[in-house]
């Protein structure tokens, strides 16, 4: 059924992520990943593709190191959430169960089974998720979202390019955080929602690691062409109004 409390599911996801970042104790973060990430999976299964943000922030913060023992111990805390995600993916809802769910919603809450609930019949398996999207792909959609990502993420891309991460190369950082979005583009038709979630996670994560001084922004950024252009007040105002 649709879980539309507090607006959208992603509001809950973002709130949990902010709570996680506010935790100061590594043990508390371990408990969070073990016991609360499974809850996020039950709220919205694709959140598993954004676990990479947890991993990057934790690595920069020193929650784990790149060695066999530390990495295995850290990844072990994701097993409950990933196990639930795999179980859901490998056990799609049957037509009979879907009908019973729709009847239950109607009789007890007077709600119709629509949107995500309705799509469960045609997009319940992993294969169906990909297959249903193939006919939607065309040049116009690719161009549109390429420009949306380029313009929308442009300032963040510039910041990352001129940033020096304590433990990561910026190219590796970009690769790690952008990989999930391309997988979700192949699986989901609501690309606008994906971009919104991806952008919010990216901004929250970058601001957090900047606040914690895990990244240093070079003064060379002031020499960037786009930064120079936007420093002109009237151009910045026009750009702000348009976008």
What are these model-derived regions, one by one?
Residues 31-56, 182:
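Membrane-interface alpha helices of multi-pass inner-membrane proteins
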Residues 50-79:
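Perimembrane helix-loop-helix junctions
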Residues 18-32, 62-65:
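Membrane-interface transmembrane helices that cradle and orient dolichyl/undecaprenyl
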Residues 19-26, 54-58, 157-158, 199-220:
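Transmembrane alpha-helices and membrane-interface helical segments
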Residues 2-10, 143-210:
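Membrane-water interface signatures at transmembrane helix termini and the short loops
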Residues 75-79, 215-243:
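Signature aromatic-anchored transmembrane alpha helix within multi-pass, membrane-resident enzymes
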Residues 29-33, 70-74, 165-176, 194, ...:
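Membrane-interfacial loop-to-transmembrane alpha-helix junctions, especially the N-terminal start
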Residues 70-156:
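Membrane-lumen/periplasm interface segments of specific transmembrane helices
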